[in-house]
């Protein structure tokens, strides 16, 4: 398979996303027990990050299946608004510099601190939502028990 790069040294789809202000990056690393994929999405100066647990080492087909089928659902279910990024827009990157940056990224296996912060915010939002749902369920069950108790008391005194 051959990939054709434009004269700027970047894949053409990257330029489209960069002009729109959207950049996505998938990092897959081994955390000591499982293989984890972290998707970082930069959209209009805000970073959102999503964590996906692959389990055993993913094959290329599994990664593609995740990107094509599960990634959009995971992004749609997210409730976080993202972490504001500070910085300016980059200019066109020299192809040699881009190649050095790519090799540096490949050596640096891990997640950025901003991505970790975004994942933490998403986790906190989910916790709060689940806590609220559980509280409503407990109150509903408590109300049902109270009504049943009232019914039994009325039934008991009805015959006198």
Curated annotation (Swiss-Prot):
Coiled-coil blocks: 69-145
Pfam families xref list: DUF2992
Name this polypeptide is given: Uncharacterized protein YjdF
Biased composition (Basic residues): 86-99, 147-160
Keyword hit for Coiled coil: yes
This protein's UniProt keywords: Coiled coil
Keyword Magnesium: no
Organism this protein belongs to: Bacillus subtilis (strain 168)
Region (Disordered) location: 82-109, 129-160
Regulation: induction: Up-regulated by mannose. Is under the control of ManR. Is subject to carbon catabolite repression (CCR) by glucose. Forms part of an operon with manP and manA.
Extent of Basic and acidic residues compositional bias: 133-146
Gene disruption phenotype: Deletion of this gene has no effect on mannose utilization.
